Swiss-Prot record:
Residues 1-15 have a biased composition (Polar residues). One of its GO terms (biological process) is cellular response to starvation. Pathway: Carbohydrate degradation. Coiled coil: none annotated. It comes from the Eukaryota. Its EC number is 3.2.1.28. It comes from Emericella nidulans (strain FGSC A4 / ATCC 38163 / CBS 112.46 / NRRL 194 / M139). This is Cytosolic neutral trehalase. It catalyses: alpha,alpha-trehalose + H2O = alpha-D-glucose + beta-D-glucose. Residues 64-78 have a biased composition (Basic and acidic residues). Activated by calcium.
Length: 751
C-alpha cells in the first residue's frame, strides 16, 4: 500500500467514528445510497444559498473556475485551509468522473489501485464556496472511494451531487462493514416468483439449442404449479416453460432433464399486493454467493447466514432455513444449488447449526418453536435419506462419504471442459467428440474407467471443494474429516434439541420419514447421543493420527488413511468432537502447518506437491485460503478456549481482505492467496476469481467473504479493530502490544 493511500483520520475509533455526524444538510454522511443519492435537494439548497449572497459579488460559473484554476496540480497551500468542520464537495458527476479516470486510471480498467501510476491527487471544489475554493483529495484509498461514489451516483441518475469528505476518508473497516450490511447483502438477495422469473429462470450454463426460462415444480406443491402456469399465460413474451417434476428422482431421470435444464422451485409465501389489492404468492428470499453463482447454494448459504446474523439480518438467515426445509421435503436433500442438474447432488450439511443460531435470535417471537421443530425434522430426514444411506454410507467403517449418484458428463460444465479427457475415448470408438459424449451419457458405449472418473468428479463437486488434489479421482471413496465432523455435529445438535426443547420425545410426521425409517414414529435424545459417540470412536480409529496431531481422510476402498494435510482437520474442533488433549495437539502440531500470512491455507504445500504445465494449480489447494475454513477454525478455537489463536487468525484474514479493499478499489473476492502480502485477490487457478471484474464500484462483494468479515470482527477486541482500521499488519500490531506489555511490567516493578 502506498504511503498516502489512507487519510490520517481513518483509525479514529473502533468504527472510524464514535457516532454518525449530521451533515450541514441535516443528513447522515454515511446514509444508504438510496437516501444519499436518491434526492437531489442538497444541490438545490447549495444553489439557493448562493442566490442569497450579496448581489455585489461577481457571479462565477463552472467555466470561470476552469479558466482560473486550469488542470494544474496546485500546491496544498493554495487549497482550502484545513478545517475542523467536515468538508462537502459540489461535484458535476459526469465531468468529474471522466477527468478522474483520465488522470488516475492509467491501466484503463475502470478502477483506481496502487498499480495505477497517476499523480494520486485530485482537486475538488467545496460546496461551501460553490466550487470556488478547491481541496486536494490524495492517495489511492480516497481517490478510489471517490470513483466508487461517483459511479454509484451515476447509477442513480445524478448529474450533480454534494459529497461529504467523510465518505471518502471513512475508516476502511467501517466502510467495508457498512457496504456489506447496507448494500452487498441487498445486492445478493434473490426471490423466485413471477416478478423476476424471466431473469432467475435463465441459465448461463444452459448449452441447449433453445435456452429459455424454465422452472420445475415438485408434485407436492400444486399451488406453485398453478401459480407459475398462470404467470406463463399472463406473460407469453417470457416463453416461460413450467414443468412438474416426477415423484421419483433417479439418475436416469435427471440425465434426461439435462435436455431441458431449469430452475427448481423454492419456498413461497402469501403476500398482499397493494397495487392489485389481492393476495398472491411471493418467493421466500435467499442470498446467492455472487458472480456467476446466482442460485441458492448449499454450504454457501450457511456461511452467509453467519454474516447475516452478525449484520442483524435475521430475516434473511431464517428465510434460507425455510428454503432448505422446502428442498429436503420436496427434493430429498439440501441441493448443491436449485437447478435441475443438481437434483442428485447435495453439499456439506450445516442445517442444524444454522437453525439453532437463527432460533437463538427469534426464540421469543411467535412461531419460533414451530420453526425449530420443522428444521430439526428436515435435518433428521436428510441425515437418514442422504448421508446414512447408500451410496454415501460405507457399511464397513460406518462413516459417510461424498458420493453423489449420477450418469454421464456433469452438464453444468461445457463438454469441452473435459475435451482432454474424453478425446482419446472418442477416437477409440471412431466418433466425433459431441457424438461420443451423447453416446456415453446414454449408455450406448460403455467405459468403466470414465464411470469411475465421473463418480469421483461428482463427489468432489458435492464436497464443495472443487477442485483439489486431495480429492481428485478418489473423493467418492473417502470418509472425509469434514463430512463426518458435520454429521457428528448433526447428531449432537439433534440430541440436544430433542432433550431440551421437546421433553426427550420428538414426534416424526409421515412426510418426514424415509423408506428406511417409515416405522419410526418418534425420536429420543439417547439414540442420537449413542450415534455421536460411535462416530467419534470410528473417526478416532480410522482418521486420527496421534503423531501428527490431526485427522486425515480415510480411503474406504483401500482401507487406509490418506496423508494429505487439509485444513478440514480443524472442522473437528468446530464440531466439538475432539478431547481437550486432541485439541491441544491440533493447536501445537497441526495449526502451524496451515497458518500463513493471510490466515489458514486450504492444505500444505508439501501435500499438494509440485505444480506446473502438466499439473496445474487447484483452487482448493495451497496457496489459497477460503472463508469457510477461516470461520470454522475461529469458532472451533474459541470453543476450546484458544481465544488468542482465534483472534490472531481472524485478524490476519481480515487484514488481508482490508488491505486488498484499500489498495484495489474496494475489491472483495471469492478466495485469496494467503501467501501474497501485496495482491492476495489475484488467483489464477482454474476458474479465476469471482468479484474481481467490476467497473467503478463493487456492488456485491462475495457472499461468504462478506460474512467472514463481519463475523470475524466480532472475534476481535476494540484495540484490534482500531489497528485493523489503520491497516496494520499482524506482526506490527503484535510487536506493539508486546512492547506495551513489557513497559507496563517494568513500570510495575519500579513501583
Amino acid at each position: 500500500m502506498d504511503d498516502s493511500a489512507l487519510p490520517s483520520n481513518t483509525s479514529n475509533g473502533i468504527n472510524g467514528r464514535t457516532a454518525h455526524r449530521r451533515s450541514s444538510s441535516g443528513g447522515d454522511p454515511f446514509q444508504h445510497p438510496d437516501i444519499y443519492y436518491g434526492n437531489p435537494e442538497s444541490v438545490e439548497r447549495i444553489k439557493n444559498r448562493r442566490r442569497a449572497f450579496s448581489s455585489s459579488l461577481k457571479s462565477f460559473n463552472r467555466q470561470d473556475f476552469h479558466e482560473m484554476l486550469g488542470d494544474r496540480n496546485t500546491r496544498r497551500g493554495s487549497m482550502d485551509p484545513t478545517s475542523g468542520n467536515p468538508r462537502k464537495f459540489l461535484i458535476d458527476v459526469d465531468a468529474t468522473l471522466h477527468s478522474l479516470l483520465e488522470r488516475e486510471d492509467s491501466d484503463r480498467n475502470m478502477q483506481i489501485t496502487i498499480e495505477d501510476v497517476g499523480p494520486k491527487v485530485f482537486s475538488l471544489g467545496t460546496a461551501a464556496s460553490h466550487g470556488y475554493n478547491r481541496f486536494d483529495v490524495r492517495g489511492t484509498y480516497m481517490l478510489s472511494n471517490l470513483l466508487q461514489e461517483l459511479t454509484i451516483a451515476k447509477d442513480y441518475g445524478r448529474k450533480q451531487i454534494v459529497l461529504d469528505e467523510e465518505r471518502l476518508s471513512e475508516n476502511p473497516v467501517s466502510r467495508l462493514s457498512r457496504l456489506i450490511k447496507n448494500s452487498f447483502w441487498n445486492s445478493l438477495t434473490r426471490r423466485i416468483d413471477g416478478r423476476n422469473i424471466e431473469v432467475a429462470g435463465r441459465d448461463p450454463k444452459d448449452w441447449t439449442d433453445d435456452p429459455r426460462p424454465r422452472i420445475y415444480v415438485p408434485p407436492g406443491a400444486p399451488e406453485q404449479l398453478e401459480y407459475y402456469r398462470r404467470i406463463a399465460e399472463e406473460k407469453p413474451e417470457l416463453r416461460l416453460d413450467v414443468q412438474e417434476l416426477a415423484a421419483e428422482i433417479t439418475p436416469e431421470y435427471v440425465r434426461d432433464l439435462n435436455e431441458k435444464p431449469g430452475l427448481l422451485a423454492l419456498a413461497m409465501e402469501e403476500k398482499y399486493d397493494e397495487k392489485t389489492g389481492k393476495t398472491d404468492f411471493a418467493g421466500v428470499p435467499f442470498v446467492v454467493p455472487g458472480g456467476r453463482f446466482n442460485e441458492l447454494y448449499g454450504w454457501d448459504s450457511y456461511m452467509e447466514s453467519l454474516g447475516l446474523l452478525a449484520s442483524n439480518r435475521v430475516d434473511l438467515a431464517k428465510a434460507m432455513v425455510i428454503n432448505f426445509c422446502f428442498c429436503i421435503k420436496h427434493y430429498g436433500k439440501i441441493l448443491n444449488a436449485n437447478r435441475s442438474y443438481y437434483l442428485t447432488r447435495s453439499q456439506p450439511p450445516f442445517l442444524t447449526d444454522m437453525a439453532l443460531r437463527v432460533y437463538d435470535r427469534i426464540q421469543n417471537e411467535p412461531g419460533a418453536m414451530d420453526f425449530l421443530r420443522h428444521a430439526i425434522l428436515a435435518a433428521i430426514k436428510e441425515y437418514y435419506s442422504v448421508w446414512m444411506a447408500e451410496p454415501r454410507l460405507d457399511p464397513v467403517s460406518g462413516l459417510s462419504r461424498y458420493r453423489s449418484p449420477g450418469i454421464g458428463v456433469p452438464p453444468e460444465t461445457e463438454a469441452s471442459h473435459f475435451l482432454h479427457l474424453l478425446t482419446p475415448y472418442a477416437e477409440k470408438h471412431g466418433m466425433e467428440f459431441k457424438e461420443f459424449v451423447q453416446a456415453y451419457n446414454y449408455g450406448k458405449v460403455k467405459e468403466p474407467e470414465l464411470d469411475e472418473y465421473f463418480m469421483h468428479d461428482r463427489a468432489v463437486r458435492e464436497s464443495g471443494h472443487d477442485t483439489s488434489y486431495r480429492l481428485e479421482r478418489v473423493c467418492g471413496n473417502l470418509a472425509t474429516v469434514d463430512l463426518n465432523s458435520l454429521l457428528y455435529k448433526y447428531e449432537v445438535d439433534i440430541a440436544r434439541v430433542i432433550r431440551v426443547y421437546f421433553k426427550d420425545k420428538l414426534e416424526i410426521p409421515v412426510e418426514f420419514r424415509t423408506p428406511a425409517t417409515k416405522d419410526i414414529q418418534s425420536e429420543s435424545s439417547s439414540v442420537w447421543d449413542r450415534r455421536a459417540r460411535r462416530r467419534k470412536m470410528r473417526m478416532d480409529t480410522y482418521l486420527w493420527d496421534e503423531e501428527k496431531g490431526m485427522y486425515f481422510d480415510y480411503d474406504t476402498v483401500k482401507q487406509e488413511r490418506t496423508n494429505y494435510e487439509s485444513a478440514t482437520t480443524l472442522w473437528a474442533m468446530w464440531a466439538g468432537l475432539v478431547t481437550p488433549r486432541q485439541a491441544s495437539a491440533m493447536i501445537t502440531k497441526a495449526l502451524p502447518r496451515f497458518e500463513e500470512f493471510g490466515g489458514i491455507v486450504s492444505g500444505t504445500e508439501e501435500s499438494r506437491g509440485a505444480v506446473g504445465l502438466n499439473r496445474p494449480t487447484r483452487q482448493w489447494d495451497y496457496p489459497y485460503g477460503w472463508a469457510p475454513q477461516q470461520m470454522l477454525a475461529w469458532t472451533g478455537f474459541a470453543r476450546y478456549g484458544y481465544q488468542e489463536e482465534a483472534e490472531r487468525l481472524a485478524y490476519k484474514w481480515l487484514y488481508m481482505i482490508t488491505k486488498a479493499f484499500v489498495d484495489f478499489n474496494g475489491v472483495v473476492v471469492e478466495k485469496y492467496d494467503v501467501t501474497r502480502p501485496i495482491d492476495p485477490h489475484r488467483v489464477d487457478a482454474e476458474y479465476g476469481n469471482q468479484g474481481v471484474d467490476f467497473k467503478g464500484a463493487p456492488r456485491e462483494g462475495f457472499g461468504w467473504v462478506n460474512a467472514s468479515y463481519v463475523y470475524g470482527l466480532e472475534m476481535l477486541n476494540a484495540h484490534q479493530r482500531r489497528a485493523l482500521g489503520a491497516v496494520t499488519p499482524w506482526e506490527t500490531y503484535s510487536k506493539a502490544v508486546s512492547a506495551q506489555g513489557s513497559d507496563t511490567v517494568l513500570e510495575n516493578r519500579s513501583e
